[in-house]
């Protein structure tokens, strides 16, 4: 081979290898700290020009092969208005999967994260603060749109959302098709606040710990599944305005729960469909109402709901099952209903829950005080079993027992419940009046108590016949050797 051919061959090889060498050289230079600092400042300046915001980045450190850490990232929209701040972000993605459009990161740590976002209308704001978070074994497949996450842990932090916007958003964008799977999510010491004054909604939560095991989110179907969830919280509040509660009793417009514990399993939600097994729930309400235990299975979809649960408070307990379609709420006469319930309702709990209604009555407060003073606080026991439809309902059992006051039992059937002109049926009634019935009458209606005396003990029996909206009663009252027949209609 001639000298000229060798010379041309060297030039050709040089031309071919030069881009590769340059790429390798630039790659190697990126591991040199002075070069990294130069790139950081150039990148921050470029992004600031493109976004119109001031972006500063203190330091980027890249170690072989891809150990990356970012420190001191700040995105400022205007002086004193910081949109985003990151104290430190560290991650080490694997190199080989990147060539296949996949991201594998064994470990990610995030320190001192802050977000302060206001939408373009200035009516909605989101503020978030996260002192520390870590992610383990993150896998992202960009082509299949799938995310797998072994573990996510956060410590401390707060999230607040405020909105005075009532316009309905129309979203014509394509739905997200990402599938996200998580092994364990552990959020510790988190504060959540939501304020929507124009919607009369104010929510605050101080969550000690929220743990989710084996979760899956299909964003295309909007289906969310969680194998197990546990929530521990110091407090949870709901209100319709910012004013303090008017009464020390239970106020449904100002609910404040403390010492909260919730545990559920097999949670599955998609649209109107929801099913879950509530293993345990307990809390204390500001009014003094204490829920010691609540458990059961809940299922609902677009057609109806099914509940099977047990409840226990300081003075009450309840166990039962309910199955009904949503069409019952639309007065569908063919809607089937099944209900069984056994309950012991503490009078104190009933007073706490009904205080707001009694407080509006002229003698409401006096009645509450008198019931307590006259020792009428024995639990009221209820037993109910019914099935059928709104056009034909069978009442298998309906018992009420208020010790020393009254005991009543009803059985029978009803038809055309929704039409007062066609409503018909027959109910059999038995009961007994106790020694404190007269005391209760004197509290509810002192005028009647002065004119009438309720004998005790007195038994009741008879029937109520309903035909086309006309009620006819045929009852007998017996006290010792005395008998009274009561007949009437309306």
State where each predicted segment sits.
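Outer-membrane beta-barrel pore domains and translocons
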Residues: 155, 312, 344-346, 399-401, ...
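Transmembrane beta-strand segments that form the barrel wall of outer-membrane beta-barrel proteins
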Residues: 190, 276-281, 303-310, 393-400, ...
